[in-house]
Curated annotation (Swiss-Prot):
The keyword Plastid applies. This is Uncharacterized 5.7 kDa protein in psbM-psbX intergenic region. The keyword Plastid applies. GO terms for cellular component: cyanelle. It comes from Cyanophora paradoxa. It is found in: Plastid, Cyanelle. Keywords: Cyanelle, Plastid.
Length: 48
């Protein structure tokens, strides 16, 4: 009984860790994307 509860707890913690990592990756990608779009806007303005 104890072992099965422990396994369930580990599964839950793994899910939370994966969610946390995915959130960090998504935030990082969105930040990079925002920076790239800002750079592209600057280039377009400078070419005009």
């Amino acid at each position: 009984m104890c072992i099965s509860i422990d396994i369930e707890r580990k599964k839950k913690s793994n899910i939370y860790i994966n969610l946390y990592i995915n959130m960090k990756i998504l935030i990082y990608i969105s930040l990079v994307f925002n920076n790239l779009s800002a750079l592209i806007d600057k280039h377009i303005i400078s070419y005009k």
